[in-house]
Amino acid sequence: MSIKKFNPNTVVKPFNNAYHHCVVIPPNAATLFISGQLGLNLDGTLPQDPQLEADKAWENVIECVQEAGMGTEDIVKITAYLTDEGDYPYFANSRSKFLGDARPASTAILVKALVKKEWRFEIEAVAAKSV
């Protein structure tokens, strides 16, 4: 059995068609849990441009997925934390750029702050792949 993604006809369609409401992971799948990824460069510096910060956060998620031998199509759940509603377009643009046609179950949450006040985005992910 492969991973199944779907949207019930009895539930409102996903916002911007950017995700699926439901994902079923088969019992024989390897599951990867990715801690919240920030938009920090390898040297720990933070891009000052919000689009670059969002891109880097997504790039870090993808690096984790690929290191586990998986691809964007294997991402089954995203939870994103944003500190400013006005930054959502940056997040959405990067999401589209890095996920392409992948449509994992998703939640975006507006929070007062992350651990450091200058951080704008944090993205957690779960990926699964049949073995």
Regions found by a protein language model. Name each.
Residues M1-E59, E63-V76, L82-V131:
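N-terminal presequence-like segments and the immediate start of the first folded domain
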